[in-house]
């Protein structure tokens, strides 16, 4: 018991031992210093809140365009390629993919300019390609909403113009292909006509040599190239005249090609009739700013001011009570 009592007495007299009650008393005595430090910290925080740039984020959710928005474009593709035209679902997926790529490119441009702007695009639901969430950060709520809507419209118009150019290029190429097809079919039809006339002329020569002027056969449907001269020279001469003035004969494919070519020439697709996205949620008007956070800033100011004030009080008291050890 004696040893424990002495030990306790020794600990109580140790000058290096921290006495919690004494510590609290020191802080209480220096409360004015702490209060002043807290007030200064709050004033600095208020000053920061007044000069700091506010950040407001507007968000929109978009997805692929619906069938009506791509109807003009898909109809044009159907005219161009018929049964080989892409499905409407493929067109919709292509449109939103091009929008996403163009929007990402614009985001990079804005981020790399002298006065950076934060424009983002990402999956709205993780793991799902659609819908997409796009957002823009500005110094005002109205500005964020307005600029986001403007950038979405800007990308939509740019992609629509690109699609219009692509479609016009395809129209030019397909028109050239169809015209070449028509020319080829016309050449073939003319060659067939010339061949027919030569065959009749050859039969006429044989008929003249054989001195056959009148038909020697009754069933003309049985006439072949070898027996055509039996029709007689008079009939063969009439046939040559008829063949020379007879229009070219074409297959149904020729007239279908001409109809397709006419339909293509009548196509009218402009950028303002094409939209490459559809809103699921239009750009929001933010009601809470991202930063600076007033409540958090003031709470941190109070805590920091209190800690600095307490440090000043304790440091000052420690210097006053400091006694250098004797050598």
UniProtKB/Swiss-Prot annotation:
The keyword Transcription regulation does not apply. GO terms for molecular function: identical protein binding; protein tyrosine kinase activity. Residues 53-294 are periplasmic. GO terms for cellular component: plasma membrane. It is found in: Cell inner membrane. Pfam families: Wzz. Pathway: Bacterial outer membrane biogenesis; lipopolysaccharide biosynthesis. Belongs to the WzzB/Cld/Rol family. Confers a modal distribution of chain length on the O-antigen component of lipopolysaccharide (LPS). Gives rise to a reduced number of short chain molecules and increases in numbers of longer molecules, with a modal value of 20. This is Chain length determinant protein. The gene is wzzB.
């Amino acid at each position: 018991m004696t040893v424990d009592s002495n030990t306790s007495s020794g600990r109580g007299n140790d000058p290096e031992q921290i006495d919690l009650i004494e510590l609290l008393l020191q802080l209480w005595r220096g409360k004015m210093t702490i209060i002043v430090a807290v007030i200064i910290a709050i004033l600095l925080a208020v000053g920061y809140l007044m000069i700091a740039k506010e950040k407001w984020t507007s968000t929109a959710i978009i997805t692929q365009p619906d069938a009506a928005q791509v109807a003009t474009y898909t109809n044009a593709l159907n005219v161009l390629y018929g049964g080989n035209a892409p499905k409407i679902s493929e067109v919709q997926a292509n449109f939103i993919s091009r929008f996403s790529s163009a929007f990402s490119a614009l985001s990079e441009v804005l981020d790399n300019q002298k006065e950076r702007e934060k424009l983002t695009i990402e999956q709205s639901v993780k793991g799902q390609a659609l819908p997409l969430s796009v957002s823009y950060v500005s110094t005002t709520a109205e500005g964020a909403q307005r600029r986001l809507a403007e950038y979405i419209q800007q990308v939509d118009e740019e992609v629509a113009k690109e699609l219009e150019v692509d479609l016009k290029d395809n129209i030019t190429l397909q028109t050239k292909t169809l015209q070449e097809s028509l020319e080829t079919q016309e050449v073939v039809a003319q060659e067939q006509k010339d061949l027919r006339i030569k065959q009749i002329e050859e039969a006429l020569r044989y008929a003249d040599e054989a001195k056959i002027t009148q038909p020697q056969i009754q069933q003309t449907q049985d006439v072949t190239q070898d027996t055509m001269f039996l029709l007689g020279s008079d009939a063969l001469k009439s046939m040559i005249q008829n063949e020379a003035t007879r229009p070219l004969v074409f297959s149904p494919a020729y007239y279908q090609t001409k109809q397709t070519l006419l339909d293509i020439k009548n196509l009218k697709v402009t950028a303002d009739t094409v939209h490459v996205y559809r809103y699921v949620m239009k750009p929001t008007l933010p009601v809470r700013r991202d930063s600076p956070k007033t409540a958090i800033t003031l709470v941190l100011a109070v805590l920091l001011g209190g800690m600095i004030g307490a440090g000043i009080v304790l440091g000052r008291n420690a210097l006053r009570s400091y006694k250098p050890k004797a050598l």
